[in-house]
Amino acid sequence: MSSRLRLKGFVRAAGVDTGLVTVFCRHTSASLTIQENADPDVQADLNEFFRRLVPENMGWLRHTSEGPDDMPAHIKAALTDVSLSIPVTAGRMVLGTWQGIYLFEHRSRPHARRVVLHVAGEPARRYRAREERSQEDRP
């Protein structure tokens, strides 16, 4: 399942009609990106671009205690985004047809990653009606 599908379920469960979903990566050697999701070559090309832009064996790096891929991963994360904001309209994220949300791992080996999701906005009508009924029941 793609990240986009998991986010759709999160937004739906939040019951927001109009608002904003924030996606935040809690790491300094990974980032988030919105990119084309139809052709896997896009992801391969992006990975290759960043590998060439920030290679692992730059002799001038001082932060090397966590391995040769660690400081280049920090630099790649600094060049990209650790958070994304996506508008929500009519209970759905407003993304282009070919846009997908990806966790961009910058280390050579995969690591366990945590992403924080937050939705803020106006509740959908079905939730507003339920909330109004529950307030009427209060003394």
Regions found by a protein language model. Give the residues of each.
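Active-site histidine-anchored catalytic micro-motif
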Residues: 1-139
